[in-house]
């Protein structure tokens, strides 16, 4: 199934989170940047964010099998709020959305196997630690795991599996050092787990 899923099927934009900041009600849990990746932070809809991490993706080398099926998704995030269909090349994807206040989880399935997942408009509450220098020090080729060790877990992210590559877009918004009165964002795009490009808004050094 050649290129049945184009990279544009990442679909749900994460950019909208950049302006959301700390708008929703949350309970703050503080921790060092080094251990944030393994800490459970207590935030509004934090359980949704945790369950989103558990959504297993399809394997492109096995005809896109192995991804979480709809029944398993319902077990993690309940009944979908809405459903639709989407063409991706020669394939038809089943698209499911779950909405929790402003937080939206999307899963796109091919043959009942998850090939795209995304979460938007979610943010943690944590100390502002990511500086412009930390951003500048991130080089193309950096692994996703190493980026998380440096920055902490992203607030939101999306993954799309295609016959070409597995693409991950991750966005940080809650732990940034930014210009006074400004909302910032840091976005990293990974191809097969390695950093391909990056962008930021309003980051500064302490």
What are the residue ranges of the model-derived segments?
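Intrinsically disordered, low-complexity Ser/Thr-rich linker and spacer segments
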Residues: 46-51, 112-137, 201-206
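Second-shell loop/turn segments in exported
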Residues: 55-64, 130-138
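Hydrophobic helical h-region of N-terminal Sec-dependent signal peptides
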Residues: 6-14
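Positively charged n-region of N-terminal signal peptides that target proteins for export
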Residues: 1-4
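Bacterial signal peptide processing site
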Residues: 21-23
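A cross-family detector of function-defining hotspots
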Residues: 29-45, 66-112, 143-206
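C-terminal motif of bacterial Sec signal peptides marking the signal peptidase cleavage site
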Residues: 15-19
